[in-house]
């Protein structure tokens, strides 16, 4: 994966449900008018915020989970053909998990209508084929492992969870 001097861990805020409730309240105006009947949260990051967005909108919530590092619809969750879904995630950096979520939803008959995220770290480099909204856009430089700047060379790469 990419390396950076900064890491934004949404799990630190998502452990406080009053904060999650407020973040979802702020996100609702961006997502409420798409006619969705279900919110989909990619594991792990989309679970807490996705469920709270669904609760506040009065919608069903399902999640996609990792199987062999790929998102999959499991636990007998099903979509009705053409069911309109919102994808809700905590952070996007390159957008790979959201693209996987969009693909999985379509493969199971759903129609994704929008994406909502707490933090967009993509620096404008992601684009999805549905509208996407974020509460915050943060721009931290990222680097390939073989192209680290001098100040990061020799530092230990850590991945506290993603």
Q: In which residue ranges do the predicted regions lie?
A:
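PRPP-associated nucleotide enzymes
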Residues: 2-162
